[in-house]
From Swiss-Prot:
The keyword Chaperone does not apply. It is an enzyme of class 2 (transferase). It comes from Desulfitobacterium hafniense (strain Y51). Coiled coil: none annotated. This is Ribosomal RNA small subunit methyltransferase A. Its EC number is 2.1.1.182. Belongs to the class I-like SAM-binding methyltransferase superfamily. rRNA adenine N(6)-methyltransferase family. RsmA subfamily. GO terms for molecular function: 16S rRNA (adenine(1518)-N(6)/adenine(1519)-N(6))-dimethyltransferase activity; RNA binding. Keywords: Cytoplasm, Methyltransferase, RNA-binding, rRNA processing, S-adenosyl-L-methionine, Transferase. Gene3D superfamilies: Ribosomal RNA adenine dimethylase-like, domain 2, Vaccinia Virus protein VP39. It catalyses: adenosine(1518)/adenosine(1519) in 16S rRNA + 4 S-adenosyl-L-methionine = N(6)-dimethyladenosine(1518)/N(6)-dimethyladenosine(1519) in 16S rRNA + 4 S-adenosyl-L-homocysteine + 4 H(+). It comes from the Bacteria. Specifically dimethylates two adjacent adenosines (A1518 and A1519) in the loop of a conserved hairpin near the 3'-end of 16S rRNA in the 30S particle. May play a critical role in biogenesis of 30S subunits.
Length: 278
């Protein structure tokens, strides 16, 4: 197989361009590509969907390891290129916005693997979109900005811990696998990237409605520099005294800050909030 650097140069000489508006940075490092594919494909019979295939350098390798790959690409010009370059491989190319993709439309009630070098300008919306479809996924292996990767796997008490950390960890067990330097791409981004692998699962002992849970979490982080009592009062539109009673019932000090609470503590607060509102 033609190596990634030569493949990319050949296609770029043919007139293909990276569109900044779509956050396109093309991966050219074979070692990184192989590492992502190896982390993604544990069972060749499990279907794979790739988000943002770009020029297809990773898609080619995924298609050698998996029996079926769906590549989701918004850029119509890249779709035509992919159809030409990937001819003969077990790849279906979907010209659509990944934020509108329902995985059940691809593999029904089964589970598959999601892989992607996610466009940095819509990383969080994409992650949230697919985490909400956790029942359709066995795992995800995604490349994101290093700072986003750190947030995804952050633990309570650190500056990186926030809504995205909690959303990811409620739905999956995540691990940052390795970092990827800017020179692995063309054009080179201004930031270091990182690859994160998620094993999708239900959070052990999760006992509240996710809608209620995330309403409380978002309210708690709505004024990050303030105490939990003040943030929840403002975010939920409830009197400060009532919030104090709610937090006392949950066993949580109202002087703490949102970034110090574990998922289990947020569950306790959610339960207390909902009982108070009934």
């Amino acid at each position: 197989m033609e190596n990634a650097a030569n493949y990319t140069r050949r296609i770029l000489k043919g007139g293909a361009k990276a569109h900044k508006s779509l956050g396109q940075n093309f991966l050219m490092d074979d070692r990184v590509i192989e590492a992502i594919a190896a982390a993604s494909i544990k069972d060749p019979e499990i279907p794979v969907v790739e988000i943002g295939p770009g020029l297809g350098v990773l898609t080619r390798v995924l298609a050698q390891k998996a029996q079926k790959v769906w590549a989701v690409e918004l850029d119509r010009g890249k779709v035509n290129l992919l159809q030409r370059e990937l001819q003969g491989l077990p790849v279906d190319i979907l010209n659509m916005d990944a934020l509108k993709l329902d995985l059940k439309d691809i593999w029904g009630t089964g589970k598959g693997v999601l892989v992607g070098n996610l466009p940095y300008y819509i990383t969080s919306p994409l992650l949230m979109h697919f985490l909400e479809q956790k029942d359709s996924l066995a795992s995800m292996v995604v490349m994101v900005q290093k700072e986003v990767a750190d947030r995804l796997v952050a633990k309570p008490g650190g500056k990186d811990y926030g809504i995205l950390s909690i959303a990811a960890q409620v739905s999956a067990q995540g691990e940052k696998l390795f970092e990827v330097p800017p020179q692995a791409f063309w054009p080179a981004p201004k930031v270091t990237s990182a690859v994160v692998r998620f094993e999708l699962r239900s959070y052990p002992g999760f006992r509240v409605k996710e809608k209620d849970f995330f309403r409380v979490v978002k309210a708690a982080f709505s004024q990050r520099r303030k105490t939990l009592g003040n943030s929840l009062a403002g975010g939920l539109g409830l009197p400060k005294q009532q919030i104090g009673e709610i937090l006392a019932a949950a066993g949580v000090d109202e002087q703490r800050r949102a970034e110090t609470l574990s998922i289990d503590e947020f569950q306790a607060v959610t339960e207390a909030v909902m009982k108070n509102l009934d």
